[in-house]
C-alpha cells in the first residue's frame, strides 16, 4: 500500500471535497452548522487533522492519526477554538444540522430521475441491519458513482496493473477497493458467507452486477456512452461490426492520474468534473425530434384475395413461396396503418428498437473509407448543443428475386415525433443525400451523390400545392420523406448478386440437415483452420448483402418559424443498412429484420479533450487564501501565543524573508508536522509596537551573537572558526526580494507547498554546498534544529571538509563551520543529506509555485 495513505497531504477546509453519503434529497447534507465558524474554517488559516484525511473525497468517522495520543492537547493559536480541531461529524440518522449542499458539489448522476427513484427505494434497506443496501456503506456507493465518471474509456485496450490486464469494469472494482481500504482498513465488507471465491472476486462480481442494474436507468441518455462505453469486440470475419478510432487521438494510460494512483495503491488526487458532466446530461433537454416509425415494404392495390388466394391484375395466382409475407397480417390487427387497403407483398423492415448512444465517428469513419463522396458533403456541427444527431440502422430482409407484379409500389414510411412544443408549429423540410456503390446503379449514369430537398407536409399535401397550410396547425409528428425510387432501384440490383453460402445454409435448415459437424460457429478451431476460413472468406464472391452495407445516406431536418424566413437545422439522421444475411467468425448467420436507432454525439469520449475535461485537478479549485494561509507548525503556535503576551510578533520594518524557519522533524506525529512555514495571516497584535526591537541589523558583527542561527550552531562557530561563503552570497540569501509564495520552509515529509522554483526569490541554490554533485539542486536549506540532534561519526568530518572549500565570511561563520558539518554527517556516512525517502515521502519538486498549494488540497 502506498505511503500516501499514512502520510496524508494537508487539505484546507475550502478545498476539502467531502460529499455526504445521503443522496435521497436534491442535494446531500453537510455534517456541521456553518453559521459561525472559527478562523480555521472561515479564513483558511489552518486545516483539521481529523476525519479521514487520507480520502478527502469520501467522508468517514475516522479520528486523528493513531500515532498521536488521544489525550495530547492540540496546538491552537489564540484566534482559534478547540471545536475546529475535534469536531465530530453528525451521523446520518441524526438530522441535527440539515443543510443542503450546493448542487455543483454533488454528482449529477444522482439527479437523474430514474436513478433518483432507485436510490429512494434503496434507502429503506439502509435502516435494516441485514439489508444495508448494495454496498452496506454509503461511501462505497459514492465511490462507485464517481468511478463511472473517473475511469477513462479504453475501447479494446487493457491496462496492465499488478501483472494482470484490467478492463474498465475491473478498474472500477480496484477503485472501490482502494476507497474501502482507506476508509474501513480492509475489504472484508465484500466477503460473502459460504463462498469459495476470494474477496477480490466477490467484489468484482458485486461491481459487475451493480453496473448492469445502474446502466438501465441511463439508457436513453444522449451521453450514455460517456458513462458506460460499449465493450463490443470486433470479431474477424464479422459483418458491419468494426468502429473506427484513431489511436493517436486517445490519451495515453501512462499520463492518466487515476490509473497511475490505482497502480500505486493509493486514492487518486483528482475528482470528477461535475460541471462538465452536468453539461453532458443537459443535452437531454435539447432533444427536438425522436424516431417513432420506420417501415419499408412493397404493396400493391391491384392484388386481390379470392378464397384466400392472391391474384394479380391479370388474374394470375401468386406463389406463396415467392411471396411469403402475403398472409402475414390477414388474421391479425397488427397490420401497418399506412398500408390501407393495399395488399402487402414483401416487408423489408418494420420493427423499431432503441440502442445506447455512440459517437458520430462510428459512422463517419466508415463513410470516409467506403463512401468518400458523401463524406465530403457532410457538415457536422461543432457542438452537440447546435444540432441533434441520431442514427438509424436498418436490417433489410431481401426478396429472393425482387420480381413483383405490375402495380407494385415500394413505400418507405419514416415518422418522427416533435418533442419540443415550440417546434410543432414550424414549417419543416428535409434534405436527403445518398450514395451507393457502382454495382448497384441500374444505368450507365453513375451520379456521385443523390441529393433531394423537399418539404414535409401533412398527408394529402405536397410542395406543388400553392395554398399549403401545414404550419397553421401544430403537429406532433412529421413524416420524413424516404427516397423510395432510389431504393427500388438499389434493391432490384442487389438480388443480381446472390449469396450462395447463406442460400445453402438456408436450404439445409429447411431440410433439417443442419448438423453440428457442419456448423462450426461455436467450435474451437485451430489457427490453421481460422487462417483457411479467413482466406476463403476474403476470396468469396461479392454478394448483395455486401453491397447494401456500402450504401450511405443521411437526412437533414430543417425548421422555420411561421413569422420568419430563417431555416434552422434541427437534426441529422444517419442511415446505415445491412441485411439479414450476415457473417460471424467466417460463418454465415441470420439476423432478424428490423431497425434500431441511437443518439450520436460530436464529442468523443475517447478523445483527449474529454479525458482531460472529465477530471478536476487540484489546482482547479485553488484560492488565494489557500496559498497565503498554510498550516502553522507547533513552533509557530507557541511563538504566536508567546508574542501576543510579551511582545510584538510582527514588526513592519522586518522583511518577511527574515522570519525564522523552525520546522519539525519527521517524528511520525501527523498532527504536529509542519506542512508549511508560518502564518501569512498576521496575529491580532501585528500592529502593536513591543518594548524590544524585533529588527535585525545586517551589519552587526558575528561576535555579538545576534542572528537567526540557533545558539548551538553559534557556539560551535565561535570555538571552531572555519571557512564559509562570501558576504555576497549570504546577503543574497537575506536581502533578496521575496513574496508570500516564496515563504516555503523545508519539511521532512511530503510538502505540497514546496517547489524547486521557490528558491528563485531566495537564491538558495547559490548559498548551499552539497557533498555530491548529483544532489538535487532544487532542495531547500537544512533545518538547523533537526541537524543539531545528529551524532558525530569518526572520520566523516575530514572527508566532508576535504571535498568542498568555502570562502570565509564575516557574517555567517557559525553557519558554515567545518566542525559543525562534521557533527551533522555522523549518522549519514559522511553526508548530511537526509535518508532516502519513499515515493510518497519525497518533496514534490515537480509542482510549479502556482500549483503548490493545490497539491495539498487533494
From Swiss-Prot:
GO terms for cellular component: nucleus; transcription regulator complex. Induction: Expression is positively regulated by flbD. Disruption phenotype: Leads to abnormally shaped phialides and abolishes production of conidia. It comes from the Eukaryota. Keywords: Activator, Conidiation, Nucleus, Sporulation, Transcription, Transcription regulation. A motif (Nuclear localization signal) lies at residues 514-521. InterPro entries: TEA/ATTS_dom (IPR000818), TEA/ATTS_sf (IPR038096), TEC1_TEAD_TF (IPR050937). Residues 128-221 bind DNA. GO terms for molecular function: DNA-binding transcription factor activity, RNA polymerase II-specific; RNA polymerase II cis-regulatory region sequence-specific DNA binding. Signal peptide: none annotated. Residues 809-822 have a biased composition (Polar residues). GO terms for biological process: conidium formation; sporulation resulting in formation of a cellular spore. Pfam families: TEA. Residues 500-522 have a biased composition (Basic and acidic residues). It is found in: Nucleus. Residues 1-22, 500-535, 792-858 are annotated as: Disordered. Belongs to the TEC1 family. PANTHER family: PROTEIN SCALLOPED (PTHR11834:SF0), TRANSCRIPTIONAL ENHANCER FACTOR TEF RELATED (PTHR11834). AbaA and wetA are pivotal regulators of conidiophore development and conidium maturation. They act individually and together to regulate their own expression and that of numerous other sporulation-specific genes. Binds to the sequence 5'-CATTCY-3', where Y is a pyrimidine, making both major- and minor-groove contacts. Plays a pivotal role in conidiation by regulating cell cycle pathways and other conidiation-related genes. This is Conidiophore development regulator abaA. It comes from Gibberella zeae (strain ATCC MYA-4620 / CBS 123657 / FGSC 9075 / NRRL 31084 / PH-1).
Amino acid at each position: 500500500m502506498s505511503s500516501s495513505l499514512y502520510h496524508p497531504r494537508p487539505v484546507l477546509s475550502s478545498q476539502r471535497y467531502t460529499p455526504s453519503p445521503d443522496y435521497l434529497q436534491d442535494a446531500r447534507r453537510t455534517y456541521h452548522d456553518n453559521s459561525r465558524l472559527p478562523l480555521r474554517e472561515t479564513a483558511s488559516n489552518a486545516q483539521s487533522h481529523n476525519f479521514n484525511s487520507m480520502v478527502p473525497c469520501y467522508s468517514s468517522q475516522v479520528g486523528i492519526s493513531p500515532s498521536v495520543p488521544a489525550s495530547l492537547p492540540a496546538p491552537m493559536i489564540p484566534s482559534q477554538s478547540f471545536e475546529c480541531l475535534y469536531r465530530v461529524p453528525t451521523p446520518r440518522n441524526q438530522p441535527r444540522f440539515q443543510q443542503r449542499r450546493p448542487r455543483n458539489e454533488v454528482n449529477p448522476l444522482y439527479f437523474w430521475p430514474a436513478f433518483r427513484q432507485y436510490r429512494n427505494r434503496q434507502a429503506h434497506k439502509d435502516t435494516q441491519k441485514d439489508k444495508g443496501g448494495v454496498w452496506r456503506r454509503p461511501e462505497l456507493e459514492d465511490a462507485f458513482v464517481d468511478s463511472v465518471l473517473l475511469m477513462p474509456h479504453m475501447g479494446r485496450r487493457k491496462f496492465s496493473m499488478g501483472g494482470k490486464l484490467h478492463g474498465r469494469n475491473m478498474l472500477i472494482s480496484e477503485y472501490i477497493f482502494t476507497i474501502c481500504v482507506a476508509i474501513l482498513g480492509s475489504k472484508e465488507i465484500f466477503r460473502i458467507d459460504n463462498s469459495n471465491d476470494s474477496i477480490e472476486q466477490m467484489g468484482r462480481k458485486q461491481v459487475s452486477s451493480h453496473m448492469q442494474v445502474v446502466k438501465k436507468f441511463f439508457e436513453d441518455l444522449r451521453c450514455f456512452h460517456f458513462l458506460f462505453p460499449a465493450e463490443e469486440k470486433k470479431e474477424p470475419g464479422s459483418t458491419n461490426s468494426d468502429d473506427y478510432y484513431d489511436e493517436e487521438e486517445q490519451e495515453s494510460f501512462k499520463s492518466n492520474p487515476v490509473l497511475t494512483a490505482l497502480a500505486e495503491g493509493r486514492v487518486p488526487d483528482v475528482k470528477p468534473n461535475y460541471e462538465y458532466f452536468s453539461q453532458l446530461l443537459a443535452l437531454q433537454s435539447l432533444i427536438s425530434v425522436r424516431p417513432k416509425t420506420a417501415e419499408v415494404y412493397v404493396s400493391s392495390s391491384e392484388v386481390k384475395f379470392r378464397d384466400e388466394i392472391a391474384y394479380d391484375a391479370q388474374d394470375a395466382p401468386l406463389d406463396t413461396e415467392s411471396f411469403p409475407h402475403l398472409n402475414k397480417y390477414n388474421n391479425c390487427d397488427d397490420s401497418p396503418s399506412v398500408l390501407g387497403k393495399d395488399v402487402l407483398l414483401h416487408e423489408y423492415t418494420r420493427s423499431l428498437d432503441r440502442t445506447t448512444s455512440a459517437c458520430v465517428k462510428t459512422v463517419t469513419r466508415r463513410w470516409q473509407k467506403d463512401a468518400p463522396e458523401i463524406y465530403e458533403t457532410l457538415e457536422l456541427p461543432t457542438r452537440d448543443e447546435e444540432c441533434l444527431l441520431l442514427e438509424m440502422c436498418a436490417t433489410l430482409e431481401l426478396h429472393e428475386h425482387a420480381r413483383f407484379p405490375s402495380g407494385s409500389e415500394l413505400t418507405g414510411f419514416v415518422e418522427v415525433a416533435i418533442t419540443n412544443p415550440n417546434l410543432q408549429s414550424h414549417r419543416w423540410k428535409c434534405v436527403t443525400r445518398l450514395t451507393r456503390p457502382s454495382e448497384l446503379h441500374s444505368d450507365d449514369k453513375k451520379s456521385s451523390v443523390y441529393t433531394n430537398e423537399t418539404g414535409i407536409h401533412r398527408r394529402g399535401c405536397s410542395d406543388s400545392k400553392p395554398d399549403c397550410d401545414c404550419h397553421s396547425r401544430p403537429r406532433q409528428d412529421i413524416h420524413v420523406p424516404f427516397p423510395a425510387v432510389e431504393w427500388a432501384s438499389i434493391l432490384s440490383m442487389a438480388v443480381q448478386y446472390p449469396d450462395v453460402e447463406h442460400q445453402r445454409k438456408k436450404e439445409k435448415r429447411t431440410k433439417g440437415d443442419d448438423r453440428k459437424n457442419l456448423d462450426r460457429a461455436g467450435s474451437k478451431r485451430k489457427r490453421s483452420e481460422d487462417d483457411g476460413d479467413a482466406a476463403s472468406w476474403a476470396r468469396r464472391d461479392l454478394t448483395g448483402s455486401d453491397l447494401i452495407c456500402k450504401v450511405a445516406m443521411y437526412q437533414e431536418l430543417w425548421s422555420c418559424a411561421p413569422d420568419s424566413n430563417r431555416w434552422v437545422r434541427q437534426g441529422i439522421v444517419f442511415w446505415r443498412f445491412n441485411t439479414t444475411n450476415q457473417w460471424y467468425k467466417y460463418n454465415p448467420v441470420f439476423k432478424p429484420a428490423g431497425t434500431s436507432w441511437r443518439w450520436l454525439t460530436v464529442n468523443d469520449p475517447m478523445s483527449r479533450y474529454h479525458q482531460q475535461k472529465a477530471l478536476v485537478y487540484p489546482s482547479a479549485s485553488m484560492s488565494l487564501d489557500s496559498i497565503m494561509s498554510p498550516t502553522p507548525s507547533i513552533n509557530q503556535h507557541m511563538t504566536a501565543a508567546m508574542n501576543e503576551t510579551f511582545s510584538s510578533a510582527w514588526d513592519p520594518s522586518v522583511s518577511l524573508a527574515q522570519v525564522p524557519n523552525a520546522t519539525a522533524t519527521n517524528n511520525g506525529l501527523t498532527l504536529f508536522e509542519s506542512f508549511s512555514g508560518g502564518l501569512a495571516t498576521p496575529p491580532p497584535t501585528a500592529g502593536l509596537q513591543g518594548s524590544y526591537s524585533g529588527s535585525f541589523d545586517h551589519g552587526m558583527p558575528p561576535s555579538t551573537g545576534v542572528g537567526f542561527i540557533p545558539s548551538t550552531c553559534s557556539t560551535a562557530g565561535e570555538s571552531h572558526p572555519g571557512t564559509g561563503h562570501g558576504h555576497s552570497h549570504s546577503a543574497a540569501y537575506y536581502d533578496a526580494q521575496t513574496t508570500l509564495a516564496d515563504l516555503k520552509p523545508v519539511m521532512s515529509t511530503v510538502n505540497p507547498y514546496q517547489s524547486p522554483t521557490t528558491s528563485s526569490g531566495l537564491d538558495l541554490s547559490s548559498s548551499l554546498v552539497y557533498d555530491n554533485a548529483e544532489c538535487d539542486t532544487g532542495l531547500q536549506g537544512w533545518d538547523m534544529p533537526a541537524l543539531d540532534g545528529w551524532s558525530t561519526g569518526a572520520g566523516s568530518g575530514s572527508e566532508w571538509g576535504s571535498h568542498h572549500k568555502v570562502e570565509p565570511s564575516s557574517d555567517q561563520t557559525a553557519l558554515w563551520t567545518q566542525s559543525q558539518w562534521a557533527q551533522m554527517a555522523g549518522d549519514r556516512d559522511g553526508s548530511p543529506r537526509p535518508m532516502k525517502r519513499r515515493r510518497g515521502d519525497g518533496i514534490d519538486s515537480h509542482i510549479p509555485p502556482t500549483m503548490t498549494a493545490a497539491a495539498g488540497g487533494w
